[in-house]
């Protein structure tokens, strides 16, 4: 199962917030931000920090993409 963080990027655009601002304000590393940009797995701690900063739920910033092979 894949994850997509497209919802997060759309929220940042709506809030007129740069990725670097999110990184600093949420206290996440640049490597975590890079993983998000590649739709790779990140820890729940990273997701919690982002949700806390943006005041959104985890379902508002990411979605699961079902495997097509099933």
Outline where the language-model segments fall.
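Short, charged recognition helix plus adjacent turn
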Residues: 2, 10-11, 35, 62-70
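The alpha-helix within a helix-turn-helix
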Residues: 12, 23, 37, 51
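Short, basic-rich loop-to-helix N-cap that marks the start of a DNA-contacting helix
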Residues: 40-52
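Short alpha-helical DNA-recognition segment
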Residues: 16-34
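A short, Lys/Arg-rich alpha-helix, primarily the initiator
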Residues: 1-20
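Residues within the helices of the helix-turn-helix
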Residues: 9, 20, 34, 48, ...
